[in-house]
Design a protein with these regions (language model features):
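Hydrophobic faces of well-ordered beta-strands that scaffold small-molecule active sites
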Residues: 54-58, 82-85, 122-125, 156-158, ...
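Acidic (Asp/Glu)-rich catalytic clusters
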Residues: 44-48, 71-79, 107-120, 143-153, ...
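H/E-rich (His + Asp/Glu) clusters that bind or coordinate divalent metals
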Residues: 64-65, 72, 230, 235-378
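Acidic-and-aromatic substrate-binding clefts and catalytic sites of carbohydrate-active enzymes
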Residues: 59-68, 90-105, 130-139, 166, ...
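Active-site gating/metal-coordination segments in enzymes
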Residues: 100-225
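An N-terminally biased module of ancient metal coordination in phosphate/nucleic-acid-related enzymes
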Residues: 26-119
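Active-site gating loops and adjacent loop-to-helix segments of metal-dependent hydrolytic enzymes
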Residues: 31, 50, 167, 203-229, ...
């Protein structure tokens, strides 16, 4: 009996050590947990789009002096025929303001494009909201917009700062539908150029940062993205302001950036498109939302195939693979390229060729003036 007791006492620390190690092994941060799927299914890693495409949503931040030969080499690998630089005026420090006030920036960028690859790059211009509300702001902004269009701008890009960060000369938030901007939207319509407008951010950025928030990891790793209803305004308020602009200016073509942040609510987005035939959407930075609802997303692309454009946003060539795979293949259960954006797995939509052609280039050729169509099939 005594020997048995001694043996058991000897085993206690061993068992304690073992269970302690096991408990430690079972604890890890969410960022660390990255299981490898054991699912054996077909996989198609597409490094090149099936058809030449127009990237309607891209940013290059040094276009006046950038080596465009190097850039086109990377574009050719992807089968990107035309890149649209939305940052036509850059974002430079002018008289103490980081803004788009430098009128020479766009001119120099256009000169670089014309001298080297005039058929491969287009640019949208931007307007400065510095001194907004002061007398003469509207006339000055309209004159600069017309000058840039005369110099080759194919559209106007509005950053998300409108409605969120920009303030007028009295220090008040500038709503997206501020009536003092009506002349800008109307001018774009008369010039026959589209307005690509980014309003708000993903709605989860406004939700409580708790265990129920799908964007918890993104907010943890990027805390500056967290929003509050009173700072600067609620998500619903900003989006409704944007939609009010769409309805009020039906002779102007608008492209809602990032699917209007409604890729997770395609029914609501469909209602908006039905109501506003002047509105288009593009898929930059929301492909993960589409990839987790392949059947509904495919139905949406089929129904609204004439209203969707291809866009990527950040220039990271290796990430285009994800877009091609979601749009073109029927692959199952594959990861997104940034866990903090989407920790879930995705599925391909396997879009038919005619829908792919419209998304990749036909729709952009139709609504953006003066593009070279020679690189695209019929």
């Amino acid at each position: 009996m005594l020997n048995i007791l001694k043996r058991n006492l000897f085993l206690v620390p061993l068992l304690t050590c073992f269970t302690g190690s096991l408990a430690k092994a079972q604890k890890m941060d969410f960022e660390e947990y990255d299981p490898r799927s054991t699912l054996v299914v077909p996989a198609h890693i597409l490094t090149r789009a099936k058809y030449p495409f127009i990237d309607i949503h891209n940013h290059q931040w040094d276009m006046p002096s950038q080596n465009l030969s190097e850039l086109t080499t990377e574009m050719d690998k992807l089968n990107m025929a035309i890149m649209n630089n939305l940052s036509g005026r850059g974002y430079r420090d002018v008289n103490g303001y980081f803004d788009v006030q430098d009128t020479t920036y766009f001119k120099k960028a256009q000169s670089n494009i014309r001298a080297h690859y005039p058929n491969r790059f287009i640019q949208f211009t931007n307007i400065s909201f510095t001194h907004f509300g002061q007398k003469g702001w509207t006339e000055h902004a309209l004159a600069e917009l017309e000058a840039d269009v005369h110099n080759g701008a194919k559209g106007l890009k509005i950053y998300k700062d409108l409605g969120m960060e920009f303030k007028d000369d009295q220090g008040r938030r500038i709503p997206v539908d501020d009536p003092r901007l009506d002349a800008i939207w109307e001018k774009c319509g008369s010039l026959h150029i589209p307005v690509l407008i980014h309003s708000a951010d993903p709605p989860s950025f406004w939700d409580p940062m708790d265990k129920y928030n799908e964007r918890w990891l993104e907010l943890k790793t990027h805390p500056d993205r967290k929003r509050e209803n009173a700072h600067p305004a609620s998500w619903k308020t900003i989006i409704e302001e944007q939609h009010h602009v769409f309805r009020a200016h039906r002779n102007t073509v608008f492209i809602a950036a990032h699917f209007g942040w409604l890729a997770n609510d395609l029914s609501s987005l469909g209602k908006l498109l039905d109501e506003c035939p002047n509105v288009y959407v593009e898929i930059a930075a929301i492909i993960a939302e589409l990839g987790r609802q392949p059947r509904q997303a495919k139905d949406f692309f089929t129904k609204y195939q004439d209203r969707i454009l291809f866009g990527k946003d950040s220039w990271v060539p290796s990430e285009y693979v994800t877009y091609f795979r979601v749009l073109e293949t029927a692959d199952e259960y594959f990861p997104y390229h940034k866990k903090y954006h989407a920790f879930w797995r995705m599925y391909g939509l396997a879009l038919p060729d005619e829908v792919l052609k419209k998304v990749y280039y036909k729709n952009a050729l139709r609504i953006i003036p003066g593009l070279d169509k020679s690189s695209f099939p019929q």
